[in-house]
UniProtKB/Swiss-Prot annotation:
Belongs to the vitamin-B12 independent methionine synthase family. It is an enzyme of class 2 (transferase). This is 5-methyltetrahydropteroyltriglutamate--homocysteine methyltransferase. L-homocysteine binds at residues 420-422, 473, 588. It catalyses: 5-methyltetrahydropteroyltri-L-glutamate + L-homocysteine = tetrahydropteroyltri-L-glutamate + L-methionine. 5-methyltetrahydropteroyltri-L-glutamate binds at residues 16-19, 110, 550, 594. GO terms for biological process: methionine biosynthetic process; methylation. Its cofactor is Zn(2+). InterPro entries: Cbl-indep_Met_Synth_N, Cobalamin-indep_Met_synthase, Met_Synth_C/arc, UROD/MetE-like_sf. It comes from Streptococcus agalactiae serotype Ia (strain ATCC 27591 / A909 / CDC SS700). The active site is at residue 683. The lineage of its organism: Bacteria, Bacillati, Bacillota, Bacilli, Lactobacillales. The gene is metE. The keyword Transferase applies.
Amino acid sequence: MVKVSNLGYPRLGEQREWKQAIEAFWAGNLEQKDLEKQLKQLRINHLKKQKEAGIDLIPVGDFSCYDHVLDLSFQFNIIPKRFDEYERNLDLYFAIARGDKDNVASSMKKWFNTNYHYIVPEWEVETKPHLQNNYLLDLYLEAREVVGDKAKPVITGPITYVSLSSGIVDFEATVQRLLPLYKQVFQDLIDAGATYIQIDEPIFVTDEGELLVDIAKSVYDFFAREVPQAHFIFQTYFESAVCLDKLSKLPVTGFGLDFIHGRAENLAAVKQGLFREKELFAGIVNGRNIWAVNLEETLALLEEIGPFVKRLTLQPSSSLLHVPVTTKYETHLDPVLKNGLSFADEKLKELELLASAFDGNKTKGYHEALSRFSALQAADFRHVALESLAEVKLERSPYKLRQALQAEKLQLPILPTTTIGSFPQSPEIRKKRLAWKRGNLSDSDYKDFIKTEIRRWIAIQEDLDLDVLVHGEFERVDMVEFFGQKLAGFTTTKLGWVQSYGSRAVKPPIIYGDVKHIQPLSLEETVYAQSLTKKPVKGMLTGPITITNWSFERDDISRSDLFNQIALAIKDEIQLLEQSGIAIIQVDEAALREGLPLRQQKQQAYLDDAVAAFKIATSSVKDETQIHTHMCYSKFDEIIDSIRALDADVISIETSRSHGDIIESFETAVYPLGIGLGVYDIHSPRIPTKEEIIVNIQRSLKCLSKEQFWVNPDCGLKTRREAETIAALEVLVSATKEVRQQLDN
């Protein structure tokens, strides 16, 4: 019989119990022993769920207090020297992730092309890896008590781990330093009764992986020789694996391949017979989107694969970390739509149905699921309608002309100061919003409260002497979900939460049908804010690429059509803002880089579509209207031409945790438009010093002119506390004024 495996399960819990426990601990409202007790109960609940769902190989080690890459760094003592004064305990673990009053946090980067963030391992001259504790063994022993021999340890492989690290001088030598530690972890697991061990090596779906195949042979030869009893699974996901003709010869028991995002290439490799002597762990249920699987199409795929492999195991295409837990609470949705959704728990059920069908037993549940899938495909809200783009202006006047008109209109100083958009959402804001959602607060009272917050923060910004203000986004839970609630073709969930970084969870909207602008999105709040001040207030919108990348997108039309549908909707809102006297409009594309395909050969088509959509949204404005955009966590040297092609008057970039890397991009490539490189890290509660911000500004001015440079935090301030936000912005403004004086002299 075919088996079913899982790669990873969401940490958050059905009601975000994980987030609540960790944040209570950070706030000093929960003792460590109580935190550990609550997290253990969550882990056990997740294990039991998967066992009851019929999963034969249940992941262990996917659960974390913050991030699984940080777990590995902590286990192997890859600890930045600046944290030497800490004992090796949970306080240190969280300090690395979040920073403290004296030390900046480690860098945070996107996990491949997802919206999940990992903590970058830092290697220094003083780094001395050793097995500080075998936490994976502890988790495995705990899991065996619950699920027995179904427990399958999961660990990020050494080649991927080092690839994701900073400070690497000699790549292969660094990998070799880790091998004895991995060996000890594996041997301890085998001695404790483990059989299958999943080693995640997603670096081998990237172009970089092609350069690492020889190292992989050396590494996995070592593991096979030193821990011969282990049944290793070489796991990839998010794309087709590279160099499978060589990787398939590695001395491992099985290979995990993604047949959702790399179907054609991976299937071709299978049909070449590369896995006839291997177990294949086939990722055939989408681990990154929330639509029910097409059972018949997937069953046909399995029948294609089956004859070419030694043994077949079914699994999701990736960890289920990237989807919500369960659809059972989404009773408010249209029944046809709800029945067409599949979150983590439903995906496990789909795998069970497919395994049974592949073994020749199409159960009643199989036919019911097939019927629900067919009903969604036939629904009348799913068309492929796209307004004609023939009348849409795609090019603006030359930047120099626009710059002069905008300078005359806005009258800003050199090095203008601003923020990215959002301000802290206090407990009072959350309380009022919840009361409003539950019907305990009238629409008018809620709007009055939001206006009070806008008025208060406009005054705060004026007191700080910021140059360009924002309304603060107090009406928004999330920069994408908010728009999903107001545009046609979107819906939102009650508990469809997904982990983004640390304890931060997002609730992506679902794009289920054609997207259209049917009502103002942020007009009222923005115009009200502008009425309170003579300084310019930015209109704050989210761009079409970010809305798509941070939503669960429909899978029945092309991405370019979806980009363009959303772009036309955003264009309508921009025109409303401009007509209402808003002179600066920011269209955030925080996730543009995130959506970049992992293979270079596929990237330009995506970037071309992204640039076209941004221009559809923004190019119809007057020359004197200043268009801003914002981007997060990006390797900009790779996409600098496309960023330039967006033709935004000003771009702000989240850079503070990797300021030097970003600066290098602009030292080697001329960027002629306005730009703000984030001068301090908003993801840490630490208040930056004036000297730090001055250094960041001065370094930026070595490759950017004072006429084009803006000073801003590196991201929105929604997750920070009010006091630390004001304190940090005071430092930012003071530092900027000092640099202005230096430039005047």
